Amino acid sequence: MVRLIVPRGMTLEAARAAVAARDTTATVDLNHFYQPQSDNKSGCAGKGCALVREIVGWPKGDAAGCAKPHRIGLIDTAINADHVSLAHSRLEVIHLDEMEGKSSGTQHGTAVAALLVGASGSRVPGLLPGAELIAVDAFRRSGGSIDVASIYDLVRAMDLLAQREVKVINLSLTGPANAVLETTVKVAAGQGIILVAAAGNEGPNAKPVYPAAYDDTIAVTAVDKGRNPYRRAVRGDYIDIAAPGVGVWTAASVTGARQKTGTSFAAPFVTAAVSVLISNDPKMSLESLEAKIRQFTDDIGEPGRDPVFGWGLLNARSLCESGSKDKPSAP
């Protein structure tokens, strides 16, 4: 992969066309930027909001059917690995080299990581405590408090995780369509890597966002504790599944915990479910995985697949119970 500087006086579009004309076999596009999908407002108030994960029946602790997940990959911002909820987790954080600008903040990455693998005895018990999580910090701080990841760094991050034989990657980020990203997503799918992507928080009437809108990803939207769609979630025919994403209890960046809202925090529920499903069959294709996970959804919208909830709301209780039944009994 090559990153080029645009000559002075030439537009980005002209530069892209010129490079593409030099080699018609190359995939050429702009170095777009992508952002995490969290909302500063919790979107939840009152007693019981922190227990929003219970609407999908996610078991507490190491439930038998969900106790042996496959290794998980995460591409996100920096992570506070010293947070009490992550202190004893099987977490590895990789920082990309040769990155420009200031380091990204730890708020988003820490929250997503803790939601996935936070210690079961902490204030932020993860969905899969004890699971191995390999996280790549692909973001940099831009414009004050905004964290962004370039296509160049996203591709490098996905390559790194592929080298580590990760079979499911959480992508709680969105941005514009990009030919290089699309090619990378297709290559990952061809390698048997399942990409779980946040649907986006740009609003119900927004245009599709990526990578969620690509066919080779699982696009996850968010719902609140009443199973209502998150008010800012992007809608579209590419939405695959819904999960809790409003008032989700997870780690704060430095210490303690707080409620978080956004499709960023719905995606980890599905990532965790995928990790469990592929633990017995790491070579499961995306097509087979999607057919399998549909068996563990509750249709809460229009009959069948719809642009608001996809196939429906993840039912973690039935997923874990199924996994428990599939395991051979002890002698």
Segments and roles (model prediction):
Residues 10-85, 308, 330:
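Protease zymogen maturation seam
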Residues 115-116, 136-138, 167, 245-326:
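Hydrolase catalytic cores
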Residues 138-215, 228-229, 235, 253-267, ...:
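Substrate-binding/access-modulating region of protease and related hydrolase catalytic domains
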Residues 75, 81-84, 91-93, 222-264, ...:
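Catalytic-core environment of secreted peptidases
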Residues 1-12:
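Aromatic/histidine-rich interaction motifs
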Residues 59-72, 78-92, 100-150, 214-216, ...:
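Subtilisin-like serine protease catalytic core
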Residues 24-26, 68-71, 130-133, 163-169, ...:
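Loop/turn elements at helix/coil->beta-strand transitions in domains of secreted/extracellular proteins
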